[in-house]
């Protein structure tokens, strides 16, 4: 059950309680809270990830690798 939606950790997030009653948080873009963006509408469930999300993940992996090399 959705508890709240707010900006948290610099992004739009939804808060909900899981089956054990613990408060959980997910990026709103991972849910159906928003109307689907154009890519998601055209993909119609045939794509696991949006290109923007994959690009952000690649950037995150690069930053982690650079920190490990320091």
From Swiss-Prot:
Tree of life domain: Bacteria
InterPro entries assigned: DUF5372 (IPR035315)
Entry keyword set: Plasmid
Entries under Pfam families matching the protein: DUF5372
Name of the protein: Uncharacterized protein y4oN
Annotated source species: Sinorhizobium fredii (strain NBRC 101917 / NGR234)
